[in-house]
Amino acid sequence: YGLNDAKMQIMQMIGQWITNPGALGTAIAIKGPPGTGKTSLVKEGISKILGREFSFIALGGTGDASFLEGHSYTYEGSMWGRIVQILMESKCMNPVIYFDELDKVSDTPRGEEIIGILTHLTDTSQNSQYHDKYFSEITFDLSKCLFIFSYNDESKVSPILRDRMYRIMTKGYEAKEKLIIAKDFLLPKIREQVAFKDDELIIPDDILTEIIKNDAITMEEEGV
């Protein structure tokens, strides 16, 4: 629901890809406050529109680069990295790979290493020659993957990485929009999860509005 400006930017971007496939790179950045539907926009929007498999990587809790590029197979208990794992799970070479909380990488101990790998992934002149440390002698062609990143604070994103991306902005919701989202999307989802019927879980509009407008509860959040 909502995000019409962001949806328009996505349609323009896809239109450019159709008319001139080489005009844009293979990386997109979505900037916006928490809770504004960035993940849903990618998973339920871009991924389904393009008919591609969707994969999610949370960067906020990533400790070091080995999570992405794996460990050498000579080490006991070593494994391949998350990127190659996604290719195995999706069984294709062109999935949509969504990296959440890019701005949190700068807070991790080895943030620069992670940024280096992400920069390589989004470099169209290099990402057809990706190497995982576990499969050191095998080259993976990631040039057909679509890499999408989300972040809240642009000042914490590497300028080099940021400049490689087609940037899409999402805005927060007004109170009336939050009410519609709560009634038409959130409550039905909650009822389904707990196996309640429509008449077994009823929250009146005035109660929802009070929750939305109560700063002590929502902390003036722009999302839901």
Residue ranges and their predicted role:
Residues 23-58, 88-89, 119:
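Walker A/P-loop
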Residues 48-78, 86, 106, 177:
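AAA+/P-loop NTPase substrate/partner-engagement loops
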Residues 90-95, 131-150, 203:
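AAA+/SF3 P-loop NTPase mechanochemical coupling elements
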Residues 91, 153-163, 167-223:
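Conserved C-terminal "switch" segment of AAA+ ATPases
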Residues 100-102, 123, 144-154:
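A short beta-strand-to-loop transition that corresponds to the Sensor-1 phosphate-sensing loop
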Residues 101-140:
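Conserved catalytic/switch belt of AAA+ P-loop NTPases
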